[in-house]
Amino acid sequence: MPTEYFERRERALLGDRFDALYAAPQDTAARGVTVSALRAAPEQFAAQADFPVEPSPFCKAGFVVQDPAFKPGRHPYHHAGVFYSQEPSASSAAPLLGVRPGMRVLDTCAAPGGKSSQLAAALGGQGLLVSNEFVAARAEVLRSNLERMGVPNAVVLNEDTGRIAAALPEFFDRVLVDAPCSGEGMFRKEAVAVTQHCEALVKQCAALGAQILDNAAACLAPGGEMIYSTCTFAPEEDEGQVAAFLQRHPEFTLADVFGNVDYSFGSPGEANRTGGLPLDVNKVRRIWPCQGGEGHFIARLVKAGTPRALPAPGTYTAEEELWLAAAAEQSKKQKGSKGGKPAKAPDARSARRESSRALREAVQGRSARSRDAGAGEATPAQSLAAWQEFARQYFPALADRPAVVHGGSVLLPVPFPQTGLHVLRAGVFVGSVQKGRFVPEHHLFTAFGALCTHREA
């Protein structure tokens, strides 16, 4: 049930439309899955799914789960990164950003990772995705989910957006701000959203959202685009928030929210929710419960200037080459924890046996404790040599990619400047030398499994 404050406010704003707009077509919260293009095309998934789904109106890769008792998070496709379990309307915002391969993309408030996984799919392994989460525990969940989804080109940060703006001014071609909000679209999904809801929370979230928007604006390059979204209905966090932002930032214009896609959904914004400030509410979008989702608000903002030219597919800019070189130089300064003790070279038979065992462990996944147990047995040079030998046998397409050693493990880095930001992951940890053999990481297979030359058809 909605709170007394919420219902009083919304009835005053909507009048006799209140009951119709908030009348959801189902008794329980809508459930859906969003298919990752890194794994499968939506049509392929729809043809092979062994549970009932129907296409979502909010996203071409989205599907509504028709059985309310079905739990997508327990399905093998979930664990394989084929889809992300996501409330249907939550999948609406990311595609509207118009992300293309080669872009630099920032997701400012990314946990648990659903929208970041959509952005990663749009990048198709080309370019850079920086997924940030301020809360440390949620940032770890974000990192884990992006690994499960097989994202190869992500940097996961645990940072304040103000520090990101200071470190990376006008760096990104696209920015998504799915702002922390009062969660009025979560009332049916999470009981805590109702119990903690009050007018003070709305005002607090609106102030925080304004701060994050200002920081995001500083991160966005000239000619870049930004999507602002919430899962709430509060005017201060939606139309009023966007209208106030445009007053503070004349370098931005409000663009048609559907300018990057060939479909539409939901309803226009509401003119009586702008706080008296000018705003073309036909350019923003609301999703009401009666439209099949739990609720969302979306606006698209464009920064003045000429967009950055994107690098050719599969290439790096000169600047990005320097960042990779700096990462390699930093790697050379590390020392093996055993003082450079040579790793024991196994004979051919044991090498094959250990490699097969390592592959099984990688596919099944290992705990951080298991992963770290043998790290540091080899010097960085020995670790890189072991990786290259392993890659030539199992992943020849990766053998010549830049690789560095970080914390005893081999990392395929993404081009990212050294900023002093709190980085949880910057690329793909492919494995480490343990007990004289190279032990691959699970992320290697989720990110690059299709490149493995020793796999079942």
Please describe what each predicted stretch is:
Residues R174, R248, G276, D280-Y316:
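Core SAM-dependent methyltransferase catalytic element
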